[in-house]
Amino acid sequence: MKSNKLTSLLCALALTGAALPLSMAEAAEPAPAAAAQEAPAEGVNYTDALMKGLSLTLPDVQSAVESGTFKNLSPEAPKPAEPEPAPLPEPEPELEPEPEPEPEPAPAPAPAAKYTADQGSAAAEIGSDGAYDGMTYSSDKADENALRVSMAYITAKGDTITKSGDTSSAENSDLYGMNAALLVTHGGHGAFTDVKISSTGNGATGAYGYSKGTYINLTNAQVSTTGAQASGVEVSQRAMMKVEASTVTTTGDQSPAIRISQNGGILLTENSDFTASGANAHGIYTQGDVTVTGGTVKAEKTKAAVIKNISSITLDGATLEGNETGALPYNIVMYSDADAIGVTGTQQFEANHASLISHKGGMFYVTGTHCRITLKDSTLTQDEAAPVFTITGNDGGYGWGDAGANGGHAEVILSQQILNGDILLDTISDINLNIKDQSIWTGAITIAPNAQEGAPYKTNADVFIAEGSTWNLTADSQITSLFNLGTIHYNGHTITLADGTVMKE
């Protein structure tokens, strides 16, 4: 059947002239034989097969088709497989570079110091919570605390702490408590009752608290220091101390009874007595917040108190006494360092039912700072010839700002207060005086040219007198403005306002 079909096709091709010359058939190379039977003979496209393979003879084609070895080269059929390319030679392995020699290890760093502040050493150090009663601690070495309490909560009753030996660094003693008899530091808490603390070395503070979170309580304590730059009680870096029913004395030069040093702190006293008898040894020297309730604070040879930068003193039923013997005859000085002038914040001084005593000079000197002074039902005793308030610039010699640009700026509030004394300002300074709550002020206001010829301040003296309060003039006065709801007794004197208005009876 297949043979008859093939024969018929060949005849049809011959009749249409599709057959090729014999010479072309002889010149063509024979087709390669299939490696294996790829498809059965059924379904072969004979016309296509003959057109692709006319170089073969009819018997050859017929025989190949019948045996299934003739290659079907129709477009629908798969093309012969191409030979696989010869595998590429494997690349020679790259030589690994020789490893670099390892560097010698760096020397191990020195162990970190236990504290960043230089506080020196300690003869005895307590680092565990507990009660330590009836103990005795002493040190006679330089830069050494007799007792140090670090990061521990302790109580102690009836202890004795003595210290001799000078500091090698007055700065470290002041800022960090180096060489203090008692140092509580780095968050330690110490409650000491009936304790006796004494020191004889320079820079040997009696009791010192350092750093935020540190707290010292002294109850019925006796603290004394005799060396120079040896405060009675002191805190810094936001530490806190409370002194109750205690006595604190210092006799050395520049040894205040109460001191708050760098970056402030809080020091509270109740019914305690503080005395500083050395030269330039203030009763209070503060860069923090001091509250004195009851008791006395006395400086025998200098100012009663110095308030530096943004800090405060509050007196409640207490006595603050000074006896200035130096070039600045004032009892309470409020100032700022040159780099602190203009910093946001206000110094504070408040006296409630208190007594302020100045044995030489006026009571308040305000320069190079902004402050608020509140006097309520307190008694002021001073040299009658000196102003009660002197609010002026300064020559810069003490480092209190630049001359001509370091005026004082004060808000003064009198509440239930009887005050006698004049007020002196210069043209780069100002006062805002508020007389209220049935207060009576007897005195005058004088505005003098700034000695360094600084640019005048926009206002110099603004006075407000509330209903029920009184101003008794003792001399002609110059002010910027007046708001009066109370009473003014001119006593034959005048008040001249900044706009030229002259007020008189």
Residues covered by each model-derived region:
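Gram-negative bacterial Sec-dependent N-terminal signal peptides
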Residues: 1-25
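Low-complexity, acidic Ser/Thr/Pro-rich repeat tracts that form intrinsically disordered stalk/linker regions
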Residues: 24-129, 133
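N-terminal segments that cap or nucleate solenoid repeat domains
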Residues: 53, 109-170, 495, 502-505
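Extracellular beta-strand/beta-solenoid scaffold signature
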Residues: 112-121, 141-148, 170-183, 201-209, ...
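All-beta strand scaffolds that present successive hydrophobic residues in beta-strands
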Residues: 129-134, 153-159, 189-194, 215-220, ...
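Fold-core signature of tandem repeat domains
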Residues: 137, 197, 209, 216-225, ...
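Post-signal peptide N-terminal segment of secreted/secretory-pathway proteins
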Residues: 156-208, 216-225
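Surface-exposed loop/turn positions within long extracellular repeat scaffolds
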Residues: 457-463, 471-483, 496-497
